[in-house]
Amino acid sequence: MNDRVRSRTIVSAQSITLPKGGDVHLVPPPPKPCVTIVVHGVNDLAGCYERIERGLCQGLNERLDMPPTLPGGQANPGYLTPAGYSLPADDEGKAENPDVVYYRRKFASGAGGAAVRSVVVPFYWGFREEEQYINKTAAHGEWLDRNGNRLDKSGTKEGGQFVNATTNLPDMWGQGFNGKLFGFISLDWFGGTMTHPLFSAAGRKYMVLAAMRLAMLIKIIRKRYPDDTINVVGHSQGTLLTLLAHAFLKDDGVAPADGVIMLNSPYGLFEPLNEKLQGWSSQQTREARLATLKGILEFICGRRHPVPALSSVALRNCQGYGAIGGPGWVGGQGCQTTIDGERLSFDERDNRGSVYLYFTPQDQTVGLANVQGIGWRGIAEQVKGLPGRTGLPQGFHQRIFTVRKRNGEKEKIGGHAPPHVYPLLLAGEKTWEDTGLGGKDRFGRANFDQGDSVLLTAPRLPLPTEARFDFDGAVTAPGENSASGVYQVRDTLDPIDAAIGVSNGGWKEKDSGHAVAQQVDAALAYRYGRDARSVERALNEGKELAQQTHVFSARELGTGMVLVTRAETPYEARLRLQTAEGHLEPLSFHSAIPNNPEHNRRVLAYDLAIGAGDSVDDVVFYQYLCRVADWRLDWKASDKGIFSQGDASVDLPDEEVRALYRAEESKNSQLIDATVAYRKSGEFPVVVGNRLPSLVGTQTILDRYHEQAVRFGGTI
């Protein structure tokens, strides 16, 4: 069958055949408006995906005038409903193997038990340590890589180690973070924390593998449904994967995504001294960074796909099946919808061929002195005398999310008609004022210069909104009442970060500071003797390392019970670190944009490109895409051993999905299989070569010193 011509079931029901009765009236759901692939960053189990999907579905419903019920009172079959996710709140974060249990998307189970009707394809990627280098016997029970970084119990790290994030694309082919300043000073000693150690890390080519997989995912969609409207929403390092994936697509002759949205991107256009001190003459120049960004954005913005015309999928222009919106959505000027109970009008815009950058000056991660990413400062008109935003295509737009107040008012996202100049720093302001950062932490951050500004070119929104970064945690005094409006938020650790803390000094084997008094049956406690070491042996027998303890003393109570005073187990330490009493950590605001569902509802949903989403209407193909996008999943019943707290059956494809896998073109199958092999063994796929795609430019500062021009593509 031609890939362009496919039939599928739109709606179905069952009924008993009866004379003059038994009719079932079916209301077909309208087509979905788009496909949206979400890509996470480093050190990330994609905890923000649930909030992105929840906000996007609600926002798209409002944008398309798609209420939950129809005028007659029946449920609206076109209403988008997000998938549910397994979250720490489900069981108070008590799962013993948190990496396997939490932040897993439930494909068939929507939020609140409703049926899933979504446009989101969640993409997952990461690093796998080679088997022989995994330390599985540390006393705290956590697995470690060769450099002492925590891994999950399958030897992987979702998104790779936090320190391995890059500010450019060529570095993804390079060595990992070396952990040293000037080659010998420990950066962990200088700037590491319990949950974010600055240990050395493995080479970064697993990021190239992830970008190849993302490009393959888009290619698979394009082959089967060439007119689908595809968005890629990348967060943090996921934005660089998105850029690199498009460079691969260009060389493969495949059309780009229709819309790209980059959140909190660490992509840098400068040459920070702190970065130079780690890589010396191998640092990429601003010329290469700008040229690469310009070329990739021109590829995305220059291939605008006009099919379907938005007016052609509006209800008033569709005879029968085909409209993606409700009665108020007309696909152009004069759309109407209801938001917060009020009816309002807005002009629809065709976002195909657009790239949006969301940035925040309060991002303390990409605002680090060795990063200075565009997700912190946006893109200025000029960058050190070179064309910055002015050199990028017209389809590039940027929005600022800031909690800073000026003249007592907060900046409204989408509140200005473009273009609008936003000063990053006015007289009397300081870059990191009221953030709660101490002197040492401020020293490690970059600063704006007075007079720095960015041109905000993103269109107005139907309902301009304020940025709020306090969706999680508790705001510390004085909060929004500070002179600048900037505030600090402190929050408890999630189970993954708490486990990192356990592996990095948050638990000590013989620490009496968190001693536990426990009554134990004498027959158990004295099984091997009455001394402390014998009692310890009895208590630890047959238990995982994370459940073992050190016994300080044991005293018989005379009631058949023994009072054992012992140290907390690593597992108990993890649970302690997950509480406000155990540990509170200030948020860096690096995930503050996607972590607030209201940002996704009121901003992101309107910047997505819409038109057609047949691939996520095709139920089996949608399931297939979600499997291809998740590197943690296998295609055969061979992974049950690591899913001790999950239902392994949900991680295996059914026969229809497996048939799509078997029919996949050879090049894609090889990449899918190589990814599975890498996840299982750490053996890196040979399919990931050492050649840059043609849109990726490279020039080190040493190259520039020797007057060697920016080189595009070729061996690196």
Curated annotation (Swiss-Prot):
- Supply the alphabetized keyword list: Host periplasm, Secreted, Virulence
Cellular component per GO? Answer: extracellular region; host cell periplasmic space
Q: Secreted among the record's keywords?
A: yes
How is the subunit organization of this protein annotated in UniProt? Interacts in the cytoplasm with the adapter protein Tla3. Interacts in the periplasm with the immunity protein Tli3.
* Superkingdom, natural source: Bacteria
- Give a yes or no for keyword Secreted in this entry: yes
Which Pfam families has this protein been placed in? Tle3 (PF24322), Tle3_C (PF11678)
Q: How is its activity regulated?
A: Neutralized by the immunity protein Tli3 in the periplasm of P.aeruginosa cells.
Q: What does this protein do?
A: Antibacterial effector. Is toxic once delivered in the periplasm of prey bacteria.
Q: Where does it live in the cell?
A: Secreted; Host periplasm
Annotated region Disordered: where? 68-87
Which organism does this sequence originate in?
A: Pseudomonas aeruginosa (strain ATCC 15692 / DSM 22644 / CIP 104116 / JCM 14847 / LMG 12228 / 1C / PRS 101 / PAO1)
The protein's name in its UniProt record? Antibacterial effector protein Tle3
